[in-house]
């Protein structure tokens, strides 16, 4: 559509990786062993490692976005989070927020928005009707469940609190993809041992089993390109993904301008 050709719109969804400290309340769940040549030996895990782990595992891992030890994603489905900011806008805000030591990263996987919509990704819902009550109950594994008269359970993964002047995440232009598979064994293993059993049982969007094409990678440095390209080519040689799954790699430092 001609009306969609605008500088503030994008045909892509961006999932970025940030540095993570496993000993904080904003952690992620990773198994002790993530497969051959994918070992992390410290509680601090850098964004480049997480990008390469996702590529080598052909999976973007789902989570409930823990903050201070509490889930921030409502409902019972873990999600993969994206922004639909145009790539140029993401690069600009990413550089500025990193300068302020905010939680963002310049390592990212870029997926075509229309294809991801067909796989179930949806824009989040910022706030509810003023007559609906957003109070929630807590489930066995820490789920935050809203009253279904306010929002059906199947849609609750999309809800993001919005209180003008106090809580405003609308600048993130967030989309989410919900994992709809069975997660009981995953949750039980975490409850008993504190970590997932293995990388295969960790929920996420598996681009091996999808027909995604035209995806891309963003890295901050040109020196990152050979290693990331190696990971992608290895997947192609193994027959895990197709030749057209990934089409580009952007190194931020090589761009003369993104405005």
Segments the model singles out, each with a brief description of its role:
Residues 1-259:
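NAD-dependent ADP-ribosyltransferases
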